[in-house]
């Protein structure tokens, strides 16, 4: 199943909420992402059917191994670009919004090279 930007955003949000709160329900996701509960319900069903997410009997959301891998990849990119943009003098709110767009479109190769270059600059 091909994941679109919105699906990646949901997985990233589940990961972030799990790190912050431990357990995540659909209502937590709706609040965090500022979307409606029906939107979350639809996204969760799609991600569950795609093998990225599971919901237990208490309605808590859990990332599958594949879902966690995607979420961590997107989250790392998000953090990297946010930090780089802020370091370049971009307003933090703008940096956050721009990082959210960039994280989805950059290739693995380009991201890897940018990250390596940034790490070399720090040494």
What is each of the regions a protein language model found here?
Residues 59-77:
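Basic, amphipathic "hinge/linker" alpha-helix immediately C-terminal to the N-terminal HTH DNA-binding motif
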Residues 4, 63-64, 107:
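Residue-level signal for threonine
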């Amino acid at each position: 199943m091909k994941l679109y930007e919105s699906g990646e955003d949901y997985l990233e949000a589940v990961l972030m909420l799990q790190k912050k709160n431990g357990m995540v329900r659909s209502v937590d996701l709706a609040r965090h992402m500022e979307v409606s509960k029906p939107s979350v319900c639809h996204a969760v069903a799609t991600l569950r059917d795609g093998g990225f997410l599971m919901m237990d009997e208490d309605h808590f959301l859990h990332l599958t191994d594949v879902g966690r891998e995607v979420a961590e990849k997107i989250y790392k990119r998000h953090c990297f670009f946010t930090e780089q943009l802020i370091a370049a003098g971009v307003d933090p709110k703008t940096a956050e919004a721009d990082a959210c767009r960039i994280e989805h479109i950059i290739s693995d190769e380009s991201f890897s090279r940018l990250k390596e270059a940034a790490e070399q600059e720090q040494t």
